């Protein structure tokens, strides 16, 4: 995954540089752009699929920790937000070319992916208390630990600074 991500970022930078050059001297070499697009589409699709698989596994582990910390009083969700979820990347790249030329960077792709964290159906970053946000962060870290432990058959070291700050007494005791 890491090699694909590094290659994707390198090609993305090259594509963006070409888009910027075209803005200064409008003579875009479509042949070069098509080569970049072909590579970025292939790698983008691979990255997207690997992220989807990871999130499907990770969210189950994460939820189990959050249920434990919150004593099953709150529901939590992780949603993988990606332009590629319901779209063909080749079509997205093709359809966004004019916009990319105006903005001078690639506006569509897995580099725009994000995770949405919901607590009882609401975005936790907007509506969660500091204690709820801290509980979510602890659950994320514990899920990372468990995932790495199972996947790599190692015991990772987890550093948590001020772990009990902003937590109510019940959550601290758990």
What are the roles of these predicted feature ranges?
Residues 25-159, 166-174:
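Conserved NTPase motor "head" modules and their coupling/switch loops across ABC/AAA+ ATPases, GTPases
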Residues 4-7, 58, 164:
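Residue-level detector of well-ordered alpha-helical segments, enriched
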Residues 1-19:
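Extended, charged alpha-helical "arm/stalk" segments used for dimerization and assembly
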Residues 18-21, 68:
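Amphipathic alpha-helical interaction surfaces
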């Amino acid at each position: 995954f890491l090699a694909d991500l590094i290659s994707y970022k390198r090609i993305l930078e090259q594509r963006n540089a070409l888009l910027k050059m075209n803005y200064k001297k409008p003579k875009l070499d479509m042949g070069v752009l098509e080569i970049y697009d072909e590579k970025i589409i292939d790698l983008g699709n691979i990255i997207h699929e690997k992220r989807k698989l990871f999130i499907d596994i990770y969210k189950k582990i994460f939820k189990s920790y959050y249920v434990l910390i919150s004593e099953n009083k709150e529901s939590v969700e992780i949603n993988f937000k990606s332009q590629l979820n319901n779209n063909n990347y080749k079509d997205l790249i093709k359809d966004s070319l004019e916009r990319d030329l105006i903005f001078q960077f690639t506006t569509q792709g897995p580099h725009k992916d994000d995770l949405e964290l919901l607590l009882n159906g609401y975005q936790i970053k907007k509506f969660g208390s500091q204690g709820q946000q801290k509980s979510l962060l602890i659950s994320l870290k514990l899920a990372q630990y468990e995932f790495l432990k199972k996947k790599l058959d190692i015991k990772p070291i987890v550093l948590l600074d001020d772990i009990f700050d902003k937590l109510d007494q019940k959550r601290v005791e758990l």
